[in-house]
Amino acid sequence: MQKQDIENRKTFRIFVWASFLNDLGSDIIHPIWPIFVTSILRANMAALGFLDGLGDALVSISTAVSGYLSDRLKKRKIFVWTGYFLGALSRIGYSLSTIWPHLIPFKIIDRTGKIRSAPRDAIVADISTDENRGKNFGFLRTMDHLGAVFGIIICIIFFKILGYKILFAIAAIPTFVSALLVFLFIKEKKSEKVKIYRGITLKDLDRNFKFFLILSSIFSLGAFSYSFLLIYAKNFGFKVGFVPVLYLIYTASASLFSLPFGKLSDKIGRKSVLILSFLLWALVCLILILSPSQMMIIFTFILYGAHKGALEPVQKTFVSELAPEEFKASCLGGYQMVIGLCALPASFIAGLLWEGLGMSAPFYFSLFLTIVSGFMLFFVKKHR
């Protein structure tokens, strides 16, 4: 048992560093992505919403497919390192794009790389205990965000010197390293009990899981991408050079709050922390609807980070606990697929509302859906 504990800790550390490096590469790009798409490649907000929504939808499909296949094949590792490799490859493609439609195939490759998520999360859930599962997911997310902070700092320092395209190419390097770490150092754990895979059905799922899936889908229809907040800030008067700083504030906030919220969910329950995350996002929407000052906009990026820090790791922990043991990766992947498929219309609808009714309109829409889904969450049975 002690030997297994050592091996589990080693596996977790490798995933932590792989996640850190991957997010470092990703977040060299993310702070300047919406401005690159709208200002350099001349896309409107609906096109930006389409690209971001397409990416989120593909994340969902690839996550679900990889979760299903990893359960069926009893293999996890291959999906993880291949996913990192595809993410690195896509960034080279971004650097070569000259008009916004060129981004579409590389966005597809990039987001298909999310085949790593459900198998990785299933491994983390398996090597964790009931007492530390929330903490482990929270720490993993914290390191994601910490890597992102370093990536954003690199972006801020070198953006004016190197420009968009060279930065995009450089962003591929740390993710290639992530792929190598997993490929070389993660040992595939053999299943102790090999069962004939019969496929997952709705009968296998707890009714609380089904209800949680429905309310999460409603919330996700209003959860448009971060790009809208950055463009909102730019249109409000922030200089282009300060936009990555706002993204840094958001990411640093998410990094600081992920682990505490993960630990808090271990103590007071997942549902309470998820309700808090909905309240934080509702507050962001209210502030931006009420035509804030620049200082209040900066504050909303802190709140947005806290919302993400509370939402993302606790969602995964909650789903992993509601899911049947033998279908854990399938449920994690299926959950991500459903809420991600909702993200495609979410960002596109937000773009259309922005273009047609003004930049506050998407926040009214999202606030309404947040209230509805938050009310529904009260009817989900508590799980520790």
Regions found by a protein language model. Give the residues of each.
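Structural signature of the two symmetry-related core transmembrane helices
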Residues: 78-92, 172, 272-287, 367
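C-terminal membrane-cytosol helix-exit motif in multi-pass small-molecule transporters
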Residues: 172-192, 373-381
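Hydrophobic core of transmembrane alpha-helices in multi-pass small-molecule transporters
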Residues: 20, 90, 101-116, 217, ...
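Central cavity-lining transmembrane alpha-helices of secondary-active solute carriers
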Residues: 50-68, 248-260
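Helix-to-loop junctions at the C-terminal end of transmembrane segments
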Residues: 62-74, 159, 258-269, 354-355
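Cytoplasmic helix-loop-helix junction between adjacent transmembrane helices
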Residues: 106-146, 318
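A membrane-interface helix-boundary motif in multi-pass transporters
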Residues: 157-173, 352-369
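Helix-loop boundary and gating motifs at the non-cytosolic
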Residues: 2-57, 209-246
